Swiss-Prot record:
GO BP annotations listed: DNA-templated transcription
Keywords annotated in UniProt: DNA-directed RNA polymerase, Magnesium, Metal-binding, Nucleotidyltransferase, Transcription, Transferase, Zinc
InterPro entries associated with the record: DNA-dir_RpoC_beta_prime, DNA-dir_RpoC_beta_prime_bact, RNA_pol_asu, RNA_pol_N, RNA_pol_Rpb1_1, RNA_pol_Rpb1_3, RNA_pol_Rpb1_3_sf, RNA_pol_Rpb1_4
Stated name of the protein: DNA-directed RNA polymerase subunit beta'
Organism this protein belongs to: Polaromonas sp. (strain JS666 / ATCC BAA-500)
Entry's Gene Ontology molecular function annotations: DNA binding; DNA-directed RNA polymerase activity; magnesium ion binding; zinc ion binding
Gene it is expressed from: rpoC
Length: 1408
């Protein structure tokens, strides 16, 4: 059998492997791979096209050119297999060995491997503890290195120039050895004793921070060498392997020219220089000539390995840099990304898509010709089985002739054989779905309208690809997992993906609207059949209000049977007819309203939860049919008279123009600054635009009609444009506003707003100037879109890469940890309800009823819709749930911590690749996000000019913990907290709203006061920021000197003067002084902060207007100074995609705020130039201090007590600080909330758990702090799971485990620092990753998906996970079996020797 296999050389499936190890090749290893030395640079003889002997394509070394035929033609055919021809020396075998046989070049002088030299950090430099510059000088023959100092005072490793060398030669003679080039470096490497070095370094791990870091790096490297058995001198090459010739082909073109791989050129150069050097050495040429040749050889080898890494790249004849071995594997077109991660697929086709409204959800229309081509092999086999064709060739002929029997067979073959459709770009898993093909005429693929939103497809010329799953297993997976009717929810948020859009929505909306005084209003019907007859007879309008007796089916929870109940409903004709398609178990109330797009989505969602998948799919198909039919019947059209321009528009605009004139007037007379004028003008126009659109929508949305009693009543309008927008079919209020209201303010390309608005609308038409202004925005939009797509794709790629190995690996990790979830309330509005946050998660502990403490949900229960209804009814406002971050599963996640699989609606299955799903969910809507950076201070801050806050609901007032306030002389409560919030609770004590209140606001409510909706809670001056005193006393100015720290400003108009704090360094003041106020009590002493001996000091910031005089009496809550908000610099707020990327890359924001490092009391130390020294003293007297630039806004004052992690200097928080001071949970909350803010602004819903999954991966590395008994080095970064495993092992042995701290890495860093070198190399920085891995002798355990794709195995996710587990179990059983057999044999042998007669052994002693 073996010989038979050999005969056809069919590769048997490779034996299984569980890991891949990478290392460095020793010269012996390279020689053992080689089949001979390449001595000549010749390639092929260009007349005979035969390879030259000993050349780069030599047949003797690499194998024959024709199958089973030697070069000279002496031996041909299979019978001479394995013979080596004595004439030409070629082995008679298959030609494909030319793809696998390697050669080698013996280098006349050693050459350093450029990767270990130049890939930063330089490994050679680390090992030898020399600088890269020095090593380069030695390698490229500019300096000598001492390799053996002998008895001289010279130091080993020291560098000397030519002149030094000559001088020392004269001085010491041959006492010492110094060498140049790679030989010198090689000698040094050979002279290293790893054990000695390691011991030395281990003892040296003390001293300065930098030294420790460097030593730790060296130590790690040395230990890696020792562990992997790699000798450092292998970093210098003596032998160069030569790639098999068929992998660097040379192809003759017609006309006597050749197309060749660049590698051949590079190899030729190496061989040429090498043989020249060999000749020079044999001739004993002068040192300087040989040296030059050696340098050139080193450069040639460098170029071959990595061209352009050092110096100028070698170029071919056409001035193009040659593609070296390194270029072959890196980058988008390198081996990893081009061939291993992205392969071309056979059995696939592509075509344009069109609409297939008659298809069922799980079907697609496949053009006959395409199907014939794709299913050819199946047809061939059927033809043979039926005996119509005897050979494949005959079958082929039969198919090509296109006889009727072929089409019959095609129908048969295609039946129940799903195909997969894919639309590029495939941004999430719904971008590939399986369908059952239906054969159609024509050449376009027909697609079901409802799956368009999942594919993001439209029919304006989109193309889609078809793939055929061939094996039975593949067909089974396609059918069960990928069939379109099994994927009706978005994995990103669990909402239905098969929601109708556009005309279907319009049809359903029109049908379910009600009209006053429609034909047949007030009729009563006994069932829907009667309604249909009346409608068909023309006696009934769809929109007429009628009464119908309808039967509803409710499901009995115990038995699962449907029980009918009948009652009379007041409804409309259209709704009654629509009720015929409702599935059993879905109440009529769900469609007894005007169905807008959102409502239809809800309807399908409810149907899925209540009636299950199958019913829902059927229902969706019926909805689609009804929608199309009714939209056609409704005959909604659009005409210019539908665009009603409001009469009030003219007045609003002229009023705005008048206001703008007034402001211009004020500006001219110097009352307002240029910036204020611009802001106010933009503000006026913004408000007016909104007003016009409000008036317009009010006019569009209502119409007056006569009811059947002859009275005039208002009803919702049947205006076509309004209906399209209102139903969600097409268009929006903003677009209607441009058509029929006014276009409003336009932005310049840089994002700033042009202050003259476009007052016209499209109905009236724009004039030239207005048209010109509006082209600005349109062009910016187009340019943005192109950029956005690329950036969004790159973000998705980085996200996928960081989470690609995260798979659900077990049911339950048994953790008791979790996160406390409550509704997110901002500015009084519930942005995300508790329901949305906990739906589909697992409770950590029992959820109790707030009043009677009964258990509502048990610990470990999945919180589904029904349970959450109960929780909401009971008034639970916070629940502790399990999250991906707190999951304790090693190398994966557990199903309980992840919770519901949003795409399928049940608990997540083991083997689901939740990481990839999370990355796709976040990346897919990326193209919808903006690329914009908002300029705050322009009109974008319009929203910020709020001056009061009012309650939205009735309830009881409460304040949050940081809220502090004082009562001033007028009895008003003045807020002195920086992060105070007013909370409103309902009668159950549930939080209803939460409002932030700025520092210096006046509260108009007290704690525990009951208020009604609409009550004002607090108000403040939005244009200035006050500086307030908390204590009473007499004002004592310090350092308030006119002309030094303050300047007198006289107002031109009013003639009043105020003091303005100026930056003292501008006025040539020698020492930096800070103007401030102290308070003096009645006895003349300084007022102290209660409980401390700090005096009350209140500092003034630059730009503050001082409001009090020296010696004035002030009470608590009084304003000492005001800072005009206009004086604040406009700061850019990063929005959209760049913000999301910034968060996931964990970048430190520019102008970041400072958080308190510890809990304690604030004080200010001695100032330095331009900086304030801020100190915090904790209760034990430990002091932490920070220098804060003067222009920063400091949020605390002398003597204030702050908590660890509280914000003390204004600015965006740094995620690293949050992790360090507040811990992982707080960090996760911060990233989740910030990312959600960006998506929410665009109206995109993403479930929190996807972001948590990414954050888990960003936190997957830890830093070793205390080594304990582990083999780690302090400061080393380790995979968290590996660390925990190692610690468990140490504890089991009773040793001291290592301690570690959390490390937050950005997604790019995290991807590159993964333990899998294959995955990291295929992501970015291929050279660096591979160099490091080779030196460390790394093993890749092939845990992630990417590694497995690259090595060509099934991925360990989904069905592949079960396969790998079964395989491993079988291997274990086989091992055990082998062991058992061996043991049995040994036992038998032993028994045999024991029972053998004693004399048989000759002189063996008798057994006693």
């Amino acid at each position: 059998m073996k010989s038979l296999l050999d005969l056809f050389k069919q590769f048997t499936p490779d034996e299984h492997f569980d890991a891949i190890k990478i290392g460095m090749a020793s010269p012996e290893k390279i020689r053992s791979w080689s089949f001979g030395e390449v001595k000549k640079p010749e390639t092929i003889n260009y007349r005979t096209f035969k390879p030259e002997r000993d050349g780069l394509f030599c047949a003797k070394i690499f194998g024959p050119i024709k199958d089973y035929e030697c070069l000279c033609g002496k031996y041909k055919r299979l019978k001479h297999r394995g013979v080596i021809c004595e004439k030409c020396g070629v082995e008679v075998t298959q030609t494909k060995v030319r793809r696998e046989r390697m050669g080698h070049i013996d280098l006349a002088a050693p050459c350093a491997h450029i990767w270990f030299l130049k890939s930063l950090p330089s490994r050679l430099g680390l090992v030898l503890d020399m600088t890269l510059r020095d090593i380069e000088r030695v390698l490229y023959f500019e300096a000598y290195v001492v390799t053996d100092p002998g008895m001289t005072p010279l130091k080993k490793f020291s560098i000397m120039s030519e002149d030094d060398y000559d001088a020392k030669r004269k001085e010491y003679g041959d006492e010492y050895v110094a060498k140049m080039g790679a030989e010198g470096i090689k000698d040094l490497l050979e002279g290293l004793d790893l054990d000695v070095e390691i011991d030395k370094l281990r003892n040296d791990l003390t001293g300065s921070e930098i030294k420790i870091k460097k030593n730790a790096k060296r130590l790690k490297l040395m230990e890696a060498f020792k562990k992997s058995g790699i000798k450092p001198e292998w970093m210098v090459l003596d032998v160069l392997p030569v790639l098999p010739p068929d992998l660097r082909p040379l192809v003759p073109l017609d006309g006597g020219r050749f197309a060749t791989s660049d590698l051949n050129d590079l190899y030729r150069r190496v061989i040429n220089r090498n043989s020249r050097l060999r000749r020079l050495l044999e001739l004993k040429a002068p040192e300087i000539i040989a040296r030059n040749e050696k340098r050139m050889l080193q450069e040639a080898v460098d170029s071959l390995l990595d061209n352009g890494r050092r110096g100028k790249a070698m170029t071919g004849a056409n001035k193009r840099a040659l593609k070296s071995l390194a270029d072959m594997i890196k980058g988008k077109s390198g081996r990893f990304r081009q061939n291993l991660l992205g392969k071309r697929v056979d059995y696939s086709g592509r075509s344009v898509i069109t609409m297939g409204p008659t298809l069922k959800l799980h079907q697609c229309g496949l053009p006959k010709l395409m199907a014939l081509e794709l299913f050819k092999p199946f047809i061939f086999s059927r033809l043979e089985a039926m005996g119509i064709a005897t050979t494949i060739k005959a079958a082929k002929k039969e198919v090509e002739s296109g006889t009727p029997v072929v089409w019959d067979i095609l129908e048969e073959v295609i039946k129940e054989h799903p195909v997969m459709l894919n639309r590029a770009p495939t941004l999430h898993r719904l971008g590939i779905q399986a369908f059952e093909p239906i054969l159609i005429e024509g050449k376009a693929i027909q697609l079901h309208p409802l799956v368009c939103s999942a594919f993001n497809a439209d029919f304006d010329g989109d193309q889609m690809a078809v793939h055929v799953p061939l094996s039975v297993e593949a067909q089974m997976e396609a059918r069960t997992l990928m069939l379109a009717s099994n994927n009706i929810l978005f994995p990103a948020n669990g909402e239905p993906s098969i929601v109708p859009s556009q005309d279907v929505v319009l049809g359903l909306y029109y049908t379910t609207r009600d009209r006053t005084n429609g034909k047949g209003e007030g009729l009563v019907f006994s069932d829907t059949g009667e309604v249909r007859r009346a409608f068909d007879a023309g006696e009934l309008d769809l929109n007429a209000r009628i009464s119908v007796r309808l039967t509803e089916w409710t499901k009995n929870k115990e038995t699962g049977e449907f029980i009918p109940s009948t009652k009379l409903w007041e409804t409309t004709g259209g709704r009654a007819l629509l009720s015929e398609i409702l599935p059993k178990g879905l109440p009529f109330s769900n469609i007894n309203k005007a169905l807008k797009k959102k409502e239809i989505s809800k309807l399908i969602n409810v149907s899925f939860r209540k009636c299950g998948l199958k019913e829902t799919v059927v229902f969706a198909d019926k909805l689609l049919q009804s929608g199309f039919r009714l939209a056609t019947k409704a005959g909604i059209s659009i005409c210019i008279d539908d665009m009603l321009v409001p009469k009030e528009k003219h007045d609003i605009i002229s009023r705005a123009q008048k206001e703008v004139k007034e402001i211009e007037q004020q500006y001219v007379s110097g009352l307002v600054t240029s910036g204020e004028r611009y802001n106010k003008v933009v503000d006026i126009w913004g408000k007016s635009g909104d007003e016009v659109s409000k008036v317009m929508m009010a006019q569009l949305s209502k119409e007056k009609v006569i009811d059947r009693h002859g009275k005039e009543v208002e009803q919702e309008s049947f205006n076509s444009i309004y209906m399209m927008a209102d139903s969600g079919a097409r268009g929006s209020a903003a677009q209607i506003r441009q058509v029929a209201g006014m276009r409003g303010l336009m932005a310049k390309p840089d994002g700033s707003i042009i202050e003259t608005p476009i007052t016209a609308n499209f109905r009236e038409g724009l004039n030239v100037l207005e048209y010109f202004i509006s082209t600005h925005g349109a062009r910016k939009g187009l340019a943005d879109t192109a950029l956005k797509t690329a950036n969004s794709g790159y973000l998705t790629r980085r996200l996928c890469d960081v989470v690609q190995d995260l798979v659900v690996t077990e049911d339950d990790c048994g953790t008791q940890e979790g996160s406390l979830m409550r509704a997110i309330v901002e500015g009084g509005e519930v942005i995300e309800s508790l329901r949305e946050r906990i739906l589909g998660r697992t409770a950590v502990e029992d959820v109790l009823h707030p009043e009677n403490r009964s258990v509502l949900a048990k610990a470990g229960a999945m919180l589904d819709e029904d349970l959450i209804d109960e929780l909401e009814a009971a008034g639970v406002d916070e629940v502790k749930v399990r999250t991906a971050l707190t999951c304790e599963t090693r190398f994966g996640l557990c199903a309980k911590c992840y919770g519901r699989d949003l795409g399928r609606g049940g608990l997540i299955n083991i083997g689901e690749a939740v990481g990839i799903i999370a990355a796709q969910s976040i990346g897919e809507p990326g193209t919808q996000l903006t690329m914009r950076t908002f300029h705050i201070g322009g009109a974008a801050s319009r929203a910020a000019i709020a001056s009061s806050v009012e309650a939205k609901s009735n309830g009881v007032i409460g304040f949050n913990a940081p809220m502090r306030y004082v009562t001033n002389g007028k009895g008003e409560l003045v807020v002195i907290a920086r992060s105070g919030e007013i909370v409103i609770h309902d009668e159950h004590g549930r939080e209803r709203e939460r409002h932030k209140v700025p520092y210096g606001a006046t509260l108009t409510v007290k704690a525990d006061q009951t208020i009604k909706a609409g009550a004002i809670l607090a108000n403040w001056d939005p244009l200035t920021r006050p500086i307030i005193t908390e204590f009473a006393g007499k004002v004592l100015f310090e350092n308030v000197e006119e002309g030094v720290t303050v300047a007198k400003q006289v107002d031109d108009v009013t003639g009043l003067s105020t003091l303005v704090v100026i930056d003292p360094k501008r006025r040539g003041a020698t020492k930096v002084i800070r103007p401030q106020v102290k308070l003096i009590d009645a006895t003349g002493n300084e007022v102290k902060i209660p409980g401390t001996d700090h005096s009350v000091t209140i500092g003034f910031q630059v730009g503050a207007l001082v409001q009090v005089r020296d010696g004035q009496d002030v009470g608590p809550g009084e304003v000492l100074a005001r800072i005009p908000v206009e004086g604040q610099k406009t700061r850019d707020i990063t929005g959209g995609l760049p913000r999301v990327a910034e968060l996931f890359e964990a970048r430190t924001p520019k102008d970041k705020g400072t958080l308190a490092e510890m809990t304690g009391t604030v004080s200010f130390g001695k100032e330095t130039k331009g900086k304030v020294r801020l100190q915090i003293t904790d209760p034990d007297g430990k002091v932490w201090e920070d220098l804060v630039p003067k222009e920063k806004n400091i949020l605390v004052h002398e003597g204030q007590v702050v908590n660890k992690g509280e914000s003390i200097v204004d600015g965006p928080a740094d995620p690293q600080d949050i992790l360090r001071l507040l811990g992982m949970e707080e960090l996760a909350r911060y990233i989740v909330d910030e990312v959600q803010d960006v998506y929410r602004l665009q109206g995109v819903k993403i479930n929190d758990k996807h972001i948590e999954v990414i954050v888990r991966q960003m936190l997957r590395r830890v830093v070793v702090e205390n080594v304990g008994d582990s083999s780690y080095i302090a400061g080393e970064q380790v995979e968290r799971s590996a660390m925990l495993d190692a610690n468990d092992a140490l504890r089991a042995e009773g040793k001291i485990p290592a301690t570690f701290s959390n490390l937050l890495l950005g997604i790019t860093k995290a991807s590159l620092s993964t333990d899998s070198f294959i995955s990291a190399a295929s992501f970015q920085e291929t050279t660096r990753v591979l160099t490091e891995a080779a030196i460390m002798g790394k093993r890749d355990e092939l845990r992630g998906l990417k590694e497995n794709v690259i090595v060509g195995r099934l991925i360990p996710a989904g069905t592949g996970m079960a396969y790998h587990e079964a395989r491993k179990a079988k291997d274990l059983m086989d091992d055990a079996e082998r062991r058992a057999i061996a043991e049995a044999e040994a036992a038998e042998l032993e028994a045999a020797t024991a029972t053998a007669p004693a004399d048989a052994g000759g002189d063996s002693p008798a057994t006693e």
